[in-house]
Amino acid sequence: MTDKTEKVAVDPETVFKRPRECDSPSYQKRQRMALLARKQGAGDSLIAGSAMSKEKKLMTGHAIPPSQLDSQIDDFTGFSKDGMMQKPGSNAPVGGNVTSSFSGDDLECRETASSPKSQREINADIKRKLVKELRCVGQKYEKIFEMLEGVQGPTAVRKRFFESIIKEAARCMRRDFVKHLKKKLKRMI
């Protein structure tokens, strides 16, 4: 008996697995491990996230030089959750509350500065959501009709959109919904 254990300990290649065992963990276990990795990788504070985004910008060469980056990161290290500034080595507060200098106008300007979506992008997004909603089991067509009203463009584009959704509904065996869509299409034309 000791010969077999010594042989297994020395040469693990001779050990065979059972037919159902595999090297990789199960799908559910991989999902749990990925979720844990995301939680650990995300960090617990916004400070870490902002510092990491600055490092990414630095790596791509679009933003801040290293000397300024270090000073900006050092500025973030002294804040606690309640807004009091602290010395890096101690937990004693140094000054008063820190306030933000952003106004509502700044946020509006940033939102308008971002690139607006084109009609095609909006319509493609609506179509993707519609197909997803069609495939769901249930008779809640109000949400689908609301999304169809959001389609942008001339009537020819809307007509093509309706026709493609009718085909998808027919493919998903939604006969009653196809009837409703055809009625709406006739009213639109």
Curated annotation (Swiss-Prot):
Q: Where is this region: Disordered?
A: 1-27, 82-118
One Pfam family for this entry, by name? INT_SG_DDX_CT_C
Give expression by tissue. Answer: Testis specific. Expressed in cancer cell lines.
Keyword Nucleus part of the UniProt annotation: yes
Please, which domain of life does this record's source organism belong to? Eukaryota
Chief localization: nucleus
For this UniProt record, give its keywords in alphabetical order, as a comma-separated list.
Nucleus
Which Gene Ontology terms of cellular component type are present?
A: nucleus
Q: Does Cytoplasm show up as a keyword for this record?
A: no
Q: Where in the cell is it found?
A: Nucleus
TM regions (residue ranges): none
Question: According to the UniProt entry, which residue ranges have a biased composition of type Basic and acidic residues?
Answer: 1-23
Q: Which InterPro entries match?
A: INT_SG_DDX_CT_C, Integrator_subunit6
- Supply the PANTHER family for this chain: DEAD/H BOX POLYPEPTIDE 26/DICE1-RELATED, INTEGRATOR COMPLEX SUBUNIT 6
Recorded family membership: Belongs to the CT45 family.
What is the name of the protein in this document?
A: Cancer/testis antigen family 45 member A5
